[in-house]
Amino acid sequence: MSLLVRPATEVKRAPAIPAADHSRDLKSVVKVLEDAPPIDREYLAPREEFEERARRVNAALQRAGHAAGFVFSDEHYRGDVPYLGGNTNLSIEQVAGVIGKNGFHIAAGLEGGYVAERLAGRAGAVVHKVEILQLADEKYPIKAEHLEQVIEAAAGGPIDHIALLTPRQVIPAGIVRFLESLFGPDGVVDAQELYYRVKYEKSEIEMRLISDAAVIADCMMQSMLAVLRPGRLETEVAAWGAWAGRMLGSEADGFKIMVGANEANRTLIGPALNRPIREGDWVHLGVAPQRDGLTACVRRSVVAVDNPSRATEEQRFWMDLVEQGYQVGEEAYRKVAAEGLPARFQEQTLVDYFAGRAAEVSARVGKRVDLASLKPYTGTHNSGYTECQEFFGAITLDSQEPLGHRIVTMLDVALRGIGDRWNDVIIPGFDYCVVENTLGKDGTTVKCLTRLPVHAQELVGAC
């Protein structure tokens, strides 16, 4: 017998989902879609938007004494090339780009180049096929160009150095070494912050697309909550969110859909897996749909019960604590925006909130708990063509500058019940709870772009 074939008696089959359950779920999700605000699914950022971005980046480069800047993207770090090249349809192969006085030039392998050419024309970007960016060890019958030719084409001639606009943590070391072979180690200059600052400030068109993505995020989350019940797999719940997102016009996601039940809450950001959701489980859910590459996000924690009253008093306590923390964080963000305060005020307010609840929590669990240290991460971060990988704009206790003028911010308030390791249980029976929304700021005005209720428990199985 082949080692690849098992006898039928050894095959463990998952229980079939009754057709009636599928029909009920479909009816629930279709109702969510029918009630969704209208979105123009075919709307894309126009050429003028990309030309203005290129102008702003070139102006920043020139002020810093650089003739050309280098950017890089792949399926995971998707933003830096599409921001200038319009190629939001990244697929499999990595791509790079060079911005200079002659505009934006994309460098890609054969297949990645075809993919880029599908959309790059709308940005006025020129696509070049180069071997250094082709897929792994495959060979392609193309007349490839050299990367140095692409650089000269963008810069308008030979240059003596190039500015790295993408973080070195993202660009493959081999590409950095190749650039150093062209310009020397001192000729590859870190200039990432100037690009960060350009991308940080959003245009009205970007805010429109992010607002559309926020509508989709709400509907995806509402769909998943509607079908969430004990006995479902995490992936089954996530599947309905994915379907709703694509039906409403999201072509990609800032991260894989999150559905984590029971111990999976300890991942904080883990994706849905083929794991059953049990009666009374904590479940964290998260979505980050993109419209024309621009991202919105919403995350919530709920309990898998068929009636909100069946959540335990203990579960309601932790949920209330985090939800109140979110309200404190949003109020502080609005104050920072309205008064032009240093952004750190908002993060300090969150830290102080959790520290102020520490004695209460310590008494509840019967031991001293440093609650502020269980706030797992910075509560507020920048977003755009990635959900949380902008490398700039997160609000920390070191953020002395005020907020930008027109920006998008993810307000992510959470609490964990574990320490530095998976089994380092600090609060028994509680692993993680989160509330995250997408905020838009324009001048002193702040709007929560995602409209799902902060307390989402009543939406579980609600449709």
Locate the predicted segments by residue.
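Active-site neighborhoods and metal-handling regions in enzymes and metal-associated proteins
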Residues: 1-463
